[in-house]
Amino acid sequence: MTDRHVLITGGAGYIGSILTSELLRANYRVTVLDSLLFGGESIVPFLNHPNFHFAKADVTEPRAVRDSIKRDWQKPDTVIHLAAIVGFPACQAVGKSVAWKYNVEATKNVHGQSAELGADRFVFASTYSNYGLSEDGKPVTEESPLNPQSLYAETKIASEEFLLSQKDSTCAPLLFRFATLYGISPRTRFDMIVNQFVLEAFTKRSLIIYQRGYSRSFVHIRDVVRGVMMGIEAEKEIVRGQIFNLGTDNGNYTKSDIVNFILKRMPETVVEYKDLTFGGDMRDISVSFEKIKRVLGFDTTLNIDDGVREVLFALKTGLIKDPTDDKYRNAQFIVQ
């Protein structure tokens, strides 16, 4: 499939580094555009791959996409836009103007350049946080009202609104609202709830859990990559202008459920439950993933127990030497 060329913004990141690997494995040409804010070690193994090209750039730059293309390669037919200030804490840390610049204005910039280059598919990484809370207790669908509870969700909704206004353009948007991710990556994050809980249980032998009964939807990072690849390989007219929740109906868990998976492998962990009276991340939501299963035939292959097991293995074996380093946490590292 060397006639297919995919450009990934944020390709050195948590999702992008695995996606790059899988696209190369599937014989795509891959251009990674990344500012390397969190380093570039995750893509070092690809540097000598004949179908890989890297360009260091900031997605807010007006020529970032155009100048990243290798001259003797065909222009990208698909652009996957992952680069962003990701997460509620990180957006709060940088403030509204910076979050808006990198999450909204950059999306418009990257889409515009992608269209000028002739790309016919634009994949956008969004979030199920856009729904806010499940007030009636029913799983939210892609048609449910949006009720953002954070600056991060506000920026993603604004980007979605722009992209959906471009659904009839030659560069057709495809939007994925990811569930909460977990699992190990070449650029692992320990500010994701499952990974974070495993790390705390491993290093402290204890956990403090707030709002134990609050529900969220979870998905393994490798399943997210599979879902994105199914989206770029689907018939264009099937996915043009479409929004898909990306996860599984079997992935809706409370925080107590996550703790139970951890206790299965670390039964010595002491758990203390507390309630938040204000502040913090108060999401309580259940999500439906019926649409992506029906339209794309997607379902997950990994579960929470798989994620707990692999994170624990990485910690026990020392594969990740200093998991407390702030580089594994978006907000803390950005503040530095």
Give the positions of each predicted feature:
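N-terminal Rossmann-like NAD(P)+-binding domain of SDR-like oxidoreductases, especially those catalyzing
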Residues: 1-170
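Structural signature of the Rossmann-like NAD(P)-dependent dehydrogenase/reductase core
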Residues: 8-9, 81, 121-124, 174-180, ...
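Conserved beta-strand segments of alpha/beta enzyme cores
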Residues: 29, 51-53, 172-174, 208, ...
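NAD(P)-dependent short-chain dehydrogenase/reductase
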Residues: 136, 149, 161-216, 221-232, ...
